[in-house]
Amino acid sequence: MTSSAHGLPRGFRRLGRRGSFLLLALLVVPGIALMVGRSVPALDPILESPVFHLYVVSAIAACALLVALATASYAVRDGRAAPVLIALGCVAVGFMMLGHGLTTPGIFGRPPNLWVARLPVLSLATFAGCLAAAARPEGAVSRLVAGSPRVALGFPMASIALASAAVAIDPTVLSGTTPVPGEGQVRTALLVASAVTLLIVGALHWRRWLLGRDRIELALVLASWLTMSALLSLAYGQFWRLSWWDYHVYLLAGFAAAAWAVVAGYRGSRTLTGAVGGITVRDPLEHVAHGQPDALHALIGAVEAKDPYTHGHSARVAELSTRIGLLLTLEPDAVRGLHQGAFLHDVGKISVPDRILNKPGDLDPEEWEQIQRHPEGD
């Protein structure tokens, strides 16, 4: 299967409405599965295995930390807030979920404790908050982070790692055996707020994915909505039952998809920009242009090499046409088609002889007729 450096493999890029339905199913199917499982005890069996649980959360942590490493490395060079915030959200999931596994009763003699239940909620709430802040580059948090990205990256990362290590070593510390007053209400509020936030952020990235079919945008949709499904399972699933294991599966799927997007992007471009640079794109026009195949850009480059006089004309026409389409709120597929058609409107020039295109003087009637016929070659 061939692919484009700008996004998904071609077969995947053509999912169209079917892909949209599959993504929307992520919002519905987990909830239905949870309700059925909780209503029919036979479908929600007890599956107690602390060691296997540690393996699963370690896999989640590895995927999240891989994404964090890539986005943090890019953030140091780029200096914008979005990659810093996404890196911090993934660091929180990575270290806290690993701490969740290490505080599980029965692992290395760990006693019953509250941190095994607290860490997943804190990690996913942090992830949701970071994604929401990253989606608003003009917001106060983004402006603060952009002012000193290295400090904004380093200090929270170290704090999260140290705090996770502390409770993993001794899960009885910091009220690890006794609930603090109001803890249940705070937990519920965090779960609800995080789920709503991830629903909205996922919808934003879904819109961007529809415009450009960009791999990293699809990864953010999956990570957002699968994490939202995980929160639902975390809230209503019963400890050690299948309904509780579901949230681990959703998290692993979401962060594995994000890790795949990063690795595939890097393999295709051999640069961090190619791997995660799409997370800094905010202009819808950029998403549309970013989603066009490399062959199209190469073709227009060949046309403009033949006619330097109109260099950049195709890109300008495509930009204006696309902005009009966006203002008219056309469907994403129509906007992408409009951009592509406008970008290619002068491709017929490639069949016009160079002696005519680059003639220093006036064109004779026959030459002028050939120039006027160039759209026929489009």
For each of these PLM feature ranges, what is it?
Residues 30-35, 92-99, 160-168, 224-234:
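Aromatic-anchored segments of alpha-helical transmembrane domains
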Residues 298-378:
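Metal-dependent catalytic cores of enzymes that make or break cyclic nucleotides
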Residues 283-294:
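Short, charged amphipathic alpha-helical "coupling" segments at sensory-output junctions
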